[in-house]
Amino acid sequence: MSKALDIARDLLACPSVTPADAGALGVLEKLLKDAGFETYRLTFSEPGADDTDNLYARIGAGHPHITFAGHTDVVPPGDNAAWSHDAFAATVDGGVLYGRGAVDMKGAIACAAAAVLDYLEANGGKPKGSISFLITGDEEGPAVNGTVKLLDWAAKRGEKFDHCLLGEPSNVNALGDCIKAGRRGSLSGTLIVEGKQGHAAYPDRAHNPLPEIASLVAALDADPLDQGSDHFPPSNLEFLSIDTGNPAWNVIPAQARARFNIRHNDCRTQDALRALIEARVEKLTGNRITARIEWEPSNADAFLTQPGAFTDLVIDAIEEVTGRKPKLDTGGGTSDARFITHYCPVLEFGLVGQTMHQIDERTPVADLDALTQIYRGVLTRYFK
């Protein structure tokens, strides 16, 4: 078996369903410590959230400094009986590795570790600069005791990163087809319309907020937020639920609430986006409807890593191994790259994401070997 496959199987065998670590960080820490890395295990806390383990490891000194980022926590496997192979048995069948986290994203962490170990072995055990690993156990959960705090801890001790590769499953159909060079932001809120509770048989004595919130939802949904930008598609507002909390069949509710989420580009800041939505609601309601918006806290603004030498270097390494020139993309959901971008340019490139979070999550072993070669090619080019 290849080194990447060995490491991946060891990681997949740890049932690290967020926020549990189940030994996953220990597998990686021992591997890196044995290779000469300085390692730091950190547990972060936050009221109302589970304490979560994290790992920072570094070898070398000075610059350039490349960090490989990722997460060892995984989503629950669902019905284990529905899997072709046990979700945490790390089974290889027909040249394919099965297991929760195979593509999201223990497989990519294994490839990065294998590539780094091979590079160090070929270069006297030290890079011409620094290599580090920034690995959290809190990405699939609330993401409050993970990368965001690990980065803050690293910055306070003087760590400075020049570039980051985050091993999220960026590819859509085949290894090498896509690099995530940015992400849309995410902003959520609740539209609230006030009415007057009353008996359903006497609507003249009540004020039903449901027709009013329905008209507001339809109007807000129909009005585009923007036309997109050079690197992002148009922002989209999606309503997720309309609720009154009313279990009765004969009571007109006093209030209606509609939850929504906005996936937005870089045309506006989140403050400007909030102001835009509130202005539209005010214009639609006038003096006829009593409505307001309650906004959820957000730490997920849109960002873009501008094309440059690092992007070109990664593209070259991918093209050399796969024969494909990857597209630079900003679609999909949020990731921990939204935190990393405040410290250094970050690109996301990992395995193919078609089976992430699904029953029978899996990756071809050939993709593990190819991704290892790509990361190895990045290191060779980076430390020329």
Swiss-Prot record:
GO terms for biological process: diaminopimelate biosynthetic process; L-arginine biosynthetic process; lysine biosynthetic process via diaminopimelate. Keywords: Amino-acid biosynthesis, Cobalt, Diaminopimelate biosynthesis, Hydrolase, Lysine biosynthesis, Metal-binding, Zinc. Its cofactor is Zn(2+); Co(2+). Zn(2+) 1 binds at residues 71, 104, 168. Gene3D superfamilies: Zn peptidases. Zn(2+) 2 binds at residues 104, 140, 357. The keyword Nuclease does not apply. It comes from the Bacteria. Its EC number is 3.5.1.18. Pathway: Amino-acid biosynthesis; L-lysine biosynthesis via DAP pathway; LL-2,6-diaminopimelate from (S)-tetrahydrodipicolinate (succinylase route): step 3/3. Binds 2 Zn(2+) or Co(2+) ions per subunit. One of its GO terms (molecular function) is succinyl-diaminopimelate desuccinylase activity. The active site is at 73, 139 (proton acceptor). The keyword Nucleotide-binding does not apply. Pfam families: M20_dimer (PF07687), Peptidase_M20 (PF01546). CDD domains: M20_DapE_proteobac. It catalyses: N-succinyl-(2S,6S)-2,6-diaminopimelate + H2O = (2S,6S)-2,6-diaminopimelate + succinate. InterPro entries: Bact_exopeptidase_dim_dom, DapE_proteobac, Peptidase_M20, Peptidase_M20_dimer, Peptidase_M20A. Homodimer. Catalyzes the hydrolysis of N-succinyl-L,L-diaminopimelic acid (SDAP), forming succinate and LL-2,6-diaminopimelate (DAP), an intermediate involved in the bacterial biosynthesis of lysine and meso-diaminopimelic acid, an essential component of bacterial cell walls. Belongs to the peptidase M20A family. DapE subfamily. This is Succinyl-diaminopimelate desuccinylase. It comes from Afipia carboxidovorans (strain ATCC 49405 / DSM 1227 / KCTC 32145 / OM5) (Oligotropha carboxidovorans).
